């Protein structure tokens, strides 16, 4: 990277938010107080951060001892120039499990987000991206440079006492990133750029965009974070390639996790033994593919579309996942039992939202969405009712 370090603003309450901020701070060209600004929820949280000596602390997952810390700049309001005007945010990384929180915070910083702003949504739900595209940045001329990034694994650690991070992962994290330069249109009207022109533009952006340069530098870091050896392997994709990958993952998860919860399964393999479950899975797949086809007709122009989103292929992937990962716990069912928030709105809720928006059939996904929300409600009611204690 050049000697001019781009300032990066970091927004969100996830372990990945802190981990990525720490890695950016470790770049050799960073000053003692790194050019990273944490955007905290409100003034109260900012005060608590300042009372914590403005530090993010990394603790060992084995003995809870501090292994590393770093001081950061922080704020809870849009940046202000010396003349009192709101300053632009050039680079923003957003990572939080709550889509509602993200949309509310983006509204808060709206005047700082310009067409030249780079915004990376890290491990976002497709529901969030669709909402932002449909309601917030519908027109190209007003839209910032949007990126989406997905990591494997997604769950890298746990946050304790707001500013303490315990890392679960050691080793290499796969980091997949793409510029959202062609979010699928809701109609087949309008011409998209030719593949050759799009390819040339993507190549130029990969070489010159500040985010790509930044993450290439991060992927070259070999130092650990305290005693934890954590590094990123960077993979840069075209938008549709990464979108297809995440859409496929979403279909697989939304066809199994809600059913596992409805049937009170503990392990994924149990779904294979339940009579009629496979028929429901087939109906869900068929409905979801129909919703995608109706909602995003422009995707049909991709030569891989009909192969990737073939009904039989998707069903085979679902069955294989239940067999190969059958020993793993049902995540959504576990969240329900632990009285935690579920991601049902990001799963079947995505297809229900699309289906209702495009006025096409979404009854199977809507039924599952209703069942899980009802189960979540009654589970919490029972936990609060002394008759069940």
From Swiss-Prot:
Tell me a GO biological process for this protein: positive regulation of mitochondrial translation
Q: Which UniProt keywords apply?
A: Activator, Mitochondrion, Translation regulation
What is the top-level taxon of the source organism? Eukaryota
Cellular component terms (Gene Ontology): cytoplasm; mitochondrial ribosome; mitochondrion
| GO molecular-function term, one example from the UniProt record | 2-dehydropantoate 2-reductase activity
Gene3D superfamilies documented for this protein: N-(1-d-carboxylethyl)-l-norvaline Dehydrogenase, domain 2
The keyword Mitochondrion appears for this protein: yes
Give the InterPro entries listed for this entry. 6-PGluconate_DH-like_C_sf (IPR008927), 6PGD_dom2 (IPR013328), Ketopantoate_reductase (IPR050838), KPA_reductase (IPR013752)
Q: List the residue ranges forming a coiled coil, or say none.
A: none
The entry's localization annotation reads: Mitochondrion
Further details from the record = Present with 2140 molecules/cell in log phase SD medium.
The record describes the protein's role as: Translational activator of cytochrome b. The cytochrome b (coB) leader RNA may represent the target sequence for CBS1 and/ or CBS2.
Q: What is this protein called?
A: Cytochrome B translational activator CBS2
**Which organism is this protein's natural source?**
Saccharomyces cerevisiae (strain ATCC 204508 / S288c)
